[in-house]
A protein has these predicted regions:
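Bacterial Sec-dependent N-terminal signal peptides
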Residues: 1-22
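Short loop/turn segments immediately following the C-termini of beta-strands
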Residues: 30-32, 80-82, 127-129, 137
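Short loop/turn segments immediately following beta-strands, especially the blade-tip
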Residues: 42-49, 89-98, 135-140
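A short beta-strand motif characteristic of beta-propeller blades
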Residues: 52-58, 100-106
């Protein structure tokens, strides 16, 4: 009986490990002097280091820094564009990698360089503006 429990435990551990080897790799890029589309999503296998393209955005300006919500349902991005910089919120479908723009807010400063989110807020740090801005979440 003890061997049966050990075998079941090993099967369970193996299946849990197999389930956790693939992740979404979400990559922001600069777009102003190249053909980049903005944000790219890849399937990443942590065991083999292989990655495969899943999806991308269209015409998102310089999403140079990203953060993903704790529940993996939203991606937030800075859109670095000098004094006209913005922060964008996207609905995120983790299975397909699809990102749908929900809204965009002025970054309240130039050249955003860092972005973080918690359960209630999205916070951006602006490099040239020398400030931070806090945006409350509205279901996005």
């Amino acid at each position: 009986m003890k061997n049966t429990y050990v075998a079941l435990l090993l099967i369970l551990i193996t299946s849990v490990q197999a389930q956790n080897k693939k992740y979404n790799l979400v990559i922001g890029t600069y777009t102003n002097s190249c053909d980049s589309k903005g944000i790219y999503v890849y399937d990443f296998d942590s065991e083999t280091a292989d990655f495969n393209f899943k999806n991308s955005t269209e015409k998102v300006v310089n999403p140079s820094y990203l953060t993903i919500s704790k529940d993996n349902k939203f991606v937030y991005s800075v859109n670095e564009s000098g004094p006209e910089s913005t922060v964008s919120a996207f609905a995120f479908d983790a299975k397909s990698g699809k990102l749908d723009l929900l809204n965009k807010q002025n970054a309240e400063g130039a050249d955003p360089c860092y972005l973080i989110n918690d359960d209630k807020n999205v916070i951006v740090a602006n490099y040239s503006g020398g400030n931070i801005a806090v945006f409350g979440k509205n279901g996005d």
